[in-house]
Amino acid sequence: MSKKQGKPEYVTAISNRKARFEYEILDTIEAGIELLGSEVKSVRLGKASLSESYAMIHHGQVWLENMQITPYEHNTLDTLEPKRSRRLLLHKAEIMRLQSKISEKGLTLIPLKAYFNKRGVLKIELGLARGKKLYDKRETIKNRDAKRQLQQLRKQY
């Protein structure tokens, strides 16, 4: 008999593919996001982008900047600004911890992926990151190529 398939832990709606290449991720944290209904529908359809977006702390709240959400095509209400600031939902202790870490030189908050959890709620995975230098990026490419060659050799034997 086959096992009953359960719901997956989460379904990735969108991901920031360049984030792990351009930044060294030191820590990750999960945050909720405050959206309107039509924006959630657009994200479910995959019409959103996290590239070139970042999070910042302003007056004790975390805001996600430059996240592109294309307006829902069947929306009858006023259309919203596609790249408006969106509030992220975190506990105050988490915000204070992030604030202290960001005050260090060279650290920033970037969204790594957006996904729907088991309950169907949209979550954003934020990464506390430090920008990579050009030689670090080259090293990442070399390591990736070496792993790929090893996999190809393993397939042959």
From Swiss-Prot:
Pfam families in the record: SmpB
GO biological-process terms attached to the record: trans-translation
Matches recorded under InterPro entries: SmpB (IPR023620), SsrA-bd_prot (IPR000037), SsrA-bd_prot_CS (IPR020081)
Gene Ontology terms, MF aspect: RNA binding
Disulfide bonds: none
GO cellular component terms, A-Z: cytosol
Key words of the record: Cytoplasm, RNA-binding
Localization in the cell: Cytoplasm
Family as reported in the entry's similarity comment: Belongs to the SmpB family.
Known function: Required for rescue of stalled ribosomes mediated by trans-translation. Binds to transfer-messenger RNA (tmRNA), required for stable association of tmRNA with ribosomes. tmRNA and SmpB together mimic tRNA shape, replacing the anticodon stem-loop with SmpB. tmRNA is encoded by the ssrA gene; the 2 termini fold to resemble tRNA(Ala) and it encodes a 'tag peptide', a short internal open reading frame. During trans-translation Ala-aminoacylated tmRNA acts like a tRNA, entering the A-site of stalled ribosomes, displacing the stalled mRNA.
Protein name stated in the entry: SsrA-binding protein
Gene: smpB
